[in-house]
Amino acid sequence: MPTYNQLVRFERKSKVRKTKSPALEANPFKSGVCLVVKTVTPKKPNSALRKVATVRLSNKRTVNVYIPGEKHSVKEHDRVLVRGGQVPDLPGVKYHVVLGAYDIAGVKGRKQGRSRYGAPRKQVVATKK
């Protein structure tokens, strides 16, 4: 416990929290340009071909981003919107692509969890009685 005089001389320092997505620089989203689209295999107990893209952000940082959902329209030189969020079984992938923004189409035929995959609402046709 510090003395009163010590607190007058040296104020208490608050702990600095380490961010999990440093490339976003405290922003919720950043835009970028896709450099490479590739597939990556996950860590040990899992097996798949996860879709990943390397993106150069607007702040000149290059990051690996995960492309969620089934099928995607991400190509080289596409403009993408990037959000934070790690993929547990892919080391070094700390970001996600936002589907349905800029040049990226949403997942087609998606009925549940549409907002996460940029899928439009199905149009209901009114019938006469």
Curated annotation (Swiss-Prot):
Region (Disordered): 110-129
UniProt keyword list: Methylation, Ribonucleoprotein, Ribosomal protein, RNA-binding, rRNA-binding, tRNA-binding
Highest taxon of the lineage: Bacteria
Classification via CDD domains: Ribosomal_S12
Keyword Ribosomal protein: yes
Molecular function terms, GO-annotated: rRNA binding; structural constituent of ribosome; tRNA binding
InterPro entries noted in UniProt: NA-bd_OB-fold (IPR012340), Ribosomal_uS12 (IPR006032), Ribosomal_uS12_bac (IPR005679)
3-methylthioaspartic acid found at: D89
GO terms under biological process: translation
Keyword Membrane on entry: no
GO CC field: small ribosomal subunit
Role according to the record: With S4 and S5 plays an important role in translational accuracy.
Family designation: Belongs to the universal ribosomal protein uS12 family.
Subunit details: Part of the 30S ribosomal subunit. Contacts proteins S8 and S17. May interact with IF1 in the 30S initiation complex.
Identification of the protein by name: Small ribosomal subunit protein uS12
UniProt organism field: Rickettsia bellii (strain RML369-C)
Gene of this entry: rpsL
